[in-house]
From Swiss-Prot:
Protein name: Succinyl-diaminopimelate desuccinylase
Record-level Gene Ontology MF annotations: acetylornithine deacetylase activity; cobalt ion binding; succinyl-diaminopimelate desuccinylase activity; zinc ion binding
Entry binding sites for Zn(2+) 1: H73, D106, E169
Gene that this sequence comes from: dapE
Sequence similarity: Belongs to the peptidase M20A family. DapE subfamily.
Keyword list, A-Z: Amino-acid biosynthesis, Cobalt, Diaminopimelate biosynthesis, Hydrolase, Lysine biosynthesis, Metal-binding, Zinc
Organism from which the protein derives: Rhizobium johnstonii (strain DSM 114642 / LMG 32736 / 3841) (Rhizobium leguminosarum bv. viciae)
Record InterPro entries: ArgE/DapE_CS, Bact_exopeptidase_dim_dom, DapE_proteobac, Peptidase_M20, Peptidase_M20_dimer, Peptidase_M20A
Principal EC category: hydrolase
Residue positions binding Zn(2+) 2: D106, E141, H366
Length: 397
């Protein structure tokens, strides 16, 4: 086996059961691919109290600039019901032109293809006039505390600097070449608790039902819309994700009700202005007596989740142009530049260098029978190889 073969690379990685937080041999397998290509490889273990230790990998080829980083993750989500899979989730079997396995799309496939692209570039043209690095974590699908964010800090403290980054997440909705992600919405979560007075359901005048107050509060969070979208981002959207009263009895008015929410927000907002708007809405709803006639304002408190994600947009023309032209020349498609979807580790990388995302088709990610077309692996490798050549050619412009 040589690292120039993306299919063999991916099969090797899939056969490593690296469900977060387990390394599962995946980083060791990647190290074995990169070291023969001339990469200096560091394994970095990160820890934080209350969270599992995580193994990460940083590898660099070259010592000079310009410096291109490829970022991704080898950890995968659980397989779910293994009996429902038509092929074992860690066997990496090929059937009817598709390679099956957990992580095939998200995102061991992207890593396998970029390794192959670098190997082919070296084989044909020698080492790039600059540096290429791999920044790979085992903690993207989990809490993302001991992963990319700490690996970036570790590398930066050692003097590492990057000019651009490509993240190999599965960005394409339907066909390879559909979409490049050039930014991401922000993400903010919180938990509201409404306090009432417990009592008998037959004697509501002696109690204060917090569910009524919670209905007011959650409605105020979702209506009216926060905005209508911007030139680069879709409208901000808030979803209530859990509601709980902790009360199994049908004849008891509960003492409190809680609800969690998450909002994905665009560049109309910052975390600070969004928190202020949410509090404004909650305070206004608390004093609305429509659902609680004759009652005092709703008593509530709110706890904000740690580590909100900030909105960002990449405007680096050389990076975007190099990738867009590579996608179009290989796939024949002109990719859409998009900021849709959820968050990724690009949210951490954007603080260090311009970052874009492009990988496989994401239709089966996290699903039973996650799989990728073998032909797509070859196409993505060709796109990455073309991108590498064009980025280094344009990086000094």
């Amino acid at each position: 086996m040589t690292a120039t073969d993306p299919v063999a690379n991916l099969q090797t990685l899939i056969r490593c059961p690296s469900v977060t937080p387990a390394e599962g041999g995946a980083l060791s397998a990647l190290e074995a691919m990169l070291a023969p290509l001339g990469f200096t490889v560091d394994r970095v273990k990160a820890s934080e109290e209350g969270t599992p230790d995580i193994e990460n990998l940083y590898a660099r080829l070259g010592t000079d600039g310009p410096h291109l980083m490829f970022a991704g993750h080898t950890d995968v989500v659980p397989v779910g019901d293994e009996a429902a899979w038509t092929h074992p989730p860690f066997a990496a079997e090929i059937s009817k032109g598709e390679l099956f396995g957990r992580g095939a799309v998200d995102m061991k496939g992207g890593i396998a293809c970029f390794v192959a692209a670098v190997a082919r570039h070296i084989e044909k043209s020698g080492q790039p006039k600059g540096s290429i690095s791999f920044l790979i974590t085992g903690d993207e699908e989990g809490p993302a505390i001991n992963g990319t964010i700490k690996l970036l800090q570790w590398a930066a403290e050692r003097g590492e600097r990057w000019d651009a980054c490509l993240v190999g997440e599965p960005t394409n909705p339907d066909r390879l070449g559909d979409m490049i992600k050039i930014g991401r919405r922000g993400s903010l979560s919180g938990k509201i608790t409404v306090h009432g007075v417990q009592g008998h359901a037959a004697y509501p005048h002696l109690a204060d039902n917090p569910v009524r107050g919670m209905l007011q509060m959650t409605h105020a969070l979702m209506d009216p819309p926060f905005d209508g979208g911007t030139d680069d981002f879709q409208p901000s959207n808030l979803e209530v994700t859990t509601v709980d009263v902790g009360n199994p009895a049908t004849n008891v008015i509960p003492a409190k009700a809680s609800a969690s929410f998450n909002i994905r927000f665009n560049d109309s907002w910052t975390v600070e202005t969004l928190r202020a708007e949410i509090l404004r809405r909650l305070d206004a709803a608390a004093g609305n007596g429509e659902l609680r006639p004759g009652r005092d304002p709703v008593k509530y408190d709110i706890v904000w989740a740690d580590r909100p994600s900030h909105v960002f947009l990449t405007r680096n023309n050389a990076l975007i142009a190099s990738l867009s032209s590579a996608v179009e020349s290989v796939s024949g498609q002109s990719p859409k530049l998009s900021t849709t979807g959820g968050t990724s580790d690009a949210r951490f990388i954007k603080d260090y260098c311009p970052v874009v995302e492009f990988g496989l088709v994401g239709q089966t990610m996290h699903m039973v029978d996650e799989r990728v077309a073998v032909a797509d692996l070859e196409t993505l490798t060709a796109i990455y190889e073309t991108f590498i050549a064009r980025w280094f050619a344009n990086a000094g412009l």
